[in-house]
């Protein structure tokens, strides 16, 4: 029987495989490209391509694809076979360095936000050698970036790699000031915890809303939900456990470090957490994880729902983005050190994050903005839409002492002067796990909790990396010219604490009084919906910062703003149209059918005994008749409102109309339809109920 260590990464062209299949010179050259970004020689590319092809064919692969992440939010691939014609009429298996490095898929059907004209169909994919190639089915998948004919990024990987390089550049400047001469690079690492729901496939296929939108648009509350807290960390049901076992095996074969699995708070909700890895690799792995979750679930007669809010009345699903910075020598820059200098270095990087989050709250908020995630944020199950940082009382006490040049209770020293007095060592576990905080320090990393479950983690990490890079640049510019480094360092950390402590909040983020304090007293941003926050991507300070660090060009920023608003509008319009369709073709006929049966029952009874009151039946018929009138009326109103959207002069105007009008009409239609469900016989109700969906998997 094979063990996990026997087959882990068996479908990945990783470092072990490269060492075994490449010559020493080729391997060393490729490692320099991966580790230092050195240019890849054509002869090396050819050797790597040949070895990659031979390895893939030996594992049953017949095709290869440049696997990329366009602005749709999911992955894309076009499969080409390895075969080339041979002179004797047969075929040979061939794969060149040119085919490895560059591809030319048709870009015309991917979102571009105006970055290319309709007739400019050509796009390019370029190999990302830092993310290992892997085999999926019979296809060798080569992780790539995707750009237009003119060179503009049309994907999520390209700006992510740019943001990682921007942070690396600025962090290296800081580390040199602290005398870290052995460090060659700084990488950001991420471990994204993935939440999801599993429902029975047969039930799923009876619900148009789940099929078309990924969430239920109608559904009365189940008699039981998550009130008993008996699902969280509870015993995993056999079908779910079997699916999880298969999922782990598939992920491990692809070198994905799936570590922890458990039941989440809501019925039918679960979580998978991996071990952290370099950000661009973690992004690739998370995209793969979501894809494989859905495929494996289907094999077990289940459907994996990744929507942020598939069911009203119970928790939705998020994705916690555990983010840290580390040197190539293995030093976590968000871990307190042993010496005064190490502690000062830690505090400087900590303050860089605090400053970044405060200065660019809007970018962090819009980086997680989608129609689905708008249902979660601020709903007493997820962090609020207001961005704040949780540090814990002990770390906050240290920062207060530094700001005020005051004694800190955790040390015998009289003042907290950096570089002179040793800051107290505090274990990682002294920071509580504040689940209500959007951005929490958890000992040696920050946990960004606002991401939606179906989101790519790329955008959130792009904005976070870029914002921190900007803070570090400001610090490096000041410190590099300082006459007295220690004094300048102390003063700068002190100033950061004073200027940006408004973003720090250690209390209950669900409390309504916090939102009032945050916005009215502290002046923090509160953008409840995607249309509220997305236009701020174009604010001058944001455009200036993102272009200065070469994360995006101005045109790329404008394109992404338009695309995100378009995606929002399209998602909600599909939901609205689905509601109209379900109301007219399923709900109204079902309620009318039940009312007709009741009316027939009354007529039959009165034919036998004319003096019978039949109060129950007549009362219910009257109520159902009133509800059907309301459902029909509100369905017509919703349909008309959707048609009115065509008059919007811009995607921004359309998104505002959806926020202000469409969502309210959808909620009004749902309210009366859900009321009708509670009054209609289950024999007549046309699709599975919440109780059946949430508790139907055994």
Language model segments and positions:
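Flexible inter-domain linker/hinge segments
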Residues: 1, 5-16, 165, 169, ...
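Active-site core of metal-dependent hydrolases
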Residues: 7-120
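Active-site-proximal loop/turn and secondary-structure-junction residues that shape catalytic pockets
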Residues: 44-48, 68-70, 98-99, 146, ...
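Hydrophobic/aromatic-rich, well-ordered segments within soluble, folded domains that form packed cores
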Residues: 61, 65-69, 285-299, 325, ...
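Short linear, low-complexity motifs centered on an aromatic residue
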Residues: 73-89, 108, 207, 214-216, ...
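Short, intrinsically disordered, low-complexity segments enriched in Ser/Thr and Pro
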Residues: 84-118, 229, 352-353, 476-484, ...
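Glycine-rich, acidic/polar active-site loops that bind/position phosphate-bearing ligands
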Residues: 120-306, 315-318, 325-562
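C-terminal amphipathic alpha-helical interaction region
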Residues: 493, 498-698
